[in-house]
Amino acid sequence: APIQHAFADGVYIRQMDMKEGSAVVGAIHNHLHAWFLLAGHVTVATEETTEDYVAPCYVVSTPGIKRVILANEDSIFVNIHKNPTNTRDISKLEKEIVSLNYKEYEEYINKNK
């Protein structure tokens, strides 16, 4: 799914436009953050739950959880992350906000206690 990036003071906005029937396996987010469904209908599955969301809605998302997102129709999904250094370097931001696996997440949490 194509990703669009936007910035405000201290904030990183990441928009993903999903086509009907597409699925995304998300990275593990390192921080509490919010996501918004601006258009469409998605199913979000974790190891614990499966939930349906219909736009417009938003969720405050718990860190440390891997998610799979399925677009039941064309959807616009937006994550809002903190960006305290106001960097626009996407690779630096991704290292701060996500982990690729649970081992990496545990290492991040232990390093940033």
Where are these regions (language model features)?
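A short, N-terminal "cap"/entry segment at the start of jelly-roll beta-barrel domains
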Residues: A1-Q15, E47, L93, S99-K113
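Glycine- and acidic-residue-biased ligand/ion/polar-headgroup-sensing regions
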Residues: H29-E48
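Conserved short histidine dyad/triad with adjacent acidic residue
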Residues: Y12-N30
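A beta-strand edge to alpha-helix "cap/lid" segment located at domain peripheries
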Residues: T43, P56-Y58, K95-I97
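Short acidic-glycine-tyrosine-enriched beta hairpin
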Residues: T46-R67
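Ligand-binding loop in jelly-roll beta-barrel domains
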Residues: T62-S91
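A generic "binding-loop/recognition-motif" signal
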Residues: S22, N30-H31, T49, G64-I65, ...
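Short hydrophobic/aromatic-rich beta-strand segments that constitute the beta-sheet cores
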Residues: V25, V44-T46, S61, N79
